[in-house]
Design a protein with these regions (language model features):
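Internal alpha-helical scaffold of NAD(P)-dependent oxidoreductase catalytic cores
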Residues: 81, 92, 116, 123-131, ...
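Alpha-helix C-terminal capping/helix-to-coil transition sites in glycosyltransferase folds
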Residues: 68-69, 191, 243
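Rossmann-like NAD(P)(H) cofactor-binding subdomain of soluble oxidoreductases
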Residues: 53, 60-68, 72-147, 165
């Protein structure tokens, strides 16, 4: 299958490397200078240093060229770039099926990625929306690029199409599972970043593994409440897109959002912490969006609320937020 991967950050590069072992892949990079360096050096030193692009992968800074005759387009930009990339795809190849690999909720509109894609598509072209879906789950880019065993979910409203795609792209060390619950898969991929910030804060303050386990479990409950309120299935959150991604992001050393929490616990202001990361931390805008959604829908998300207060209320300390969270009244677990 001929693939176009749009976005040459860590995740886009990792997908190009993984699928480029067996399929022709064109990797689109917005920066001409970076595209030329990746093409020449066969590695992305800026975003994913070390892993080497296989011969099947070519690199370009021309998005239309990348899309070209692709049989499947994979959008691997940050969430903020999804709308523009979908619009380009709608104008360039309106009949080509596509996936997105970004996670989060748009703060301005509280839209999930599939809602952004559908809206932009209808605003851009009269053509019917082709088959599409999300790829998500517990997957650090570096480990995927290194060929370490990884399992993710491909969720689409067209489950038969999703199954056909995973039959083509599935590899022993990059396992794909089909799913029909797009909303549930996207909620899991979004909210786990918020909970990971909380887990990083707790770790940075010196709390133990009991605390981490409590945050993961109660974070899963918040994730499930939001997903159900949006029409998703709670069972989805018990799989790779929910619990799997939540565990990885709250515990893994490569987690940007967990590292952000560690920096905030040390007293770093948000702007300095984000600058120190050097990469996008989707948990920050997602925290803002999910709290707005929770308020609108009338559901309780106390961990997300606590993270929101730490991120967006000037002068709030990590210690104060934790004490407020721990002072909540006891209640039934379910």
């Amino acid at each position: 299958m001929r693939l176009a991967v749009l976005g040459a950050g860590a995740w886009g590069t990792a997908l190009a490397i993984a699928w480029g072992q067996h399929h022709p892949v064109t990797l689109w990079c917005r920066s001409r200078a970076l595209a030329q360096r990746i093409h020449t050096q066969r590695t992305n030193e800026r975003y994913l240093a070390g892993p080497v692009l296989p011969p099947n992968v070519r690199v370009t800074d021309d998005c239309a060229t990348a899309i070209g005759d692709a049989e499947l387009v994979v959008i691997a930009t940050p969430l903020a770039g999804l709308a523009q990339t979908v619009a380009t795809l709608a104008q360039t190849a309106p009949h080509t099926p596509f996936l997105w690999a970004c996670k989060g909720i748009l703060p301005d509109t509280q839209e999930l990625p599939h809602e952004i894609a559908a809206r932009v598509w209808s605003e851009t072209t009269a053509a019917a929306l082709p088959d599409h879906g999300v790829i998500t789950g517990p997957s650090f880019a570096l480990e995927v690029a290194q060929g370490l065993p990884t399992a993710v979910v491909l969720a689409s409203h067209n489950a038969q199409w999703a199954k056909a795609i995973i039959d083509t792209l599935h590899q022993p060390r990059f396992r794909l599972y089909a799913h029909h619950d797009v909303t549930g898969a996207e909620v899991g991929g979004a909210i786990k970043n918020v909970i990971a910030i909380a887990a990083g804060v707790a770790e940075g303050l010196g709390f133990g593994l009991n605390t981490r386990a409590a945050l993961i479990t109660r974070g899963l409950a918040e994730m499930g409440r939001l997903a159900e309120a949006l029409g998703a299935e709670r069972e989805t959150l018990m799989g790779l897109a929910g619990m799997g991604d939540l565990i990885l992001t709250c515990t893994g050393g490569l987690s940007r959002n967990r590292r952000l929490g560690l920096l905030l616990a040390s007293g770093e202001p948000l702007s300095a912490a984000l600058a120190a990361l050097g990469h996008v931390a989707e948990g920050v805008p997602t925290t803002q969006a999910c709290v707005q959604l929770a308020n609108t829908l009338g559901i309780e998300m106390p961990i997300a609320q606590a993270v929101h207060e730490l991120l967006f209320t000037p002068g709030t300390s990590a210690e104060a937020v934790v004490e407020k969270l721990l002072a909540r009244d006891p209640k039934f677990e379910f």
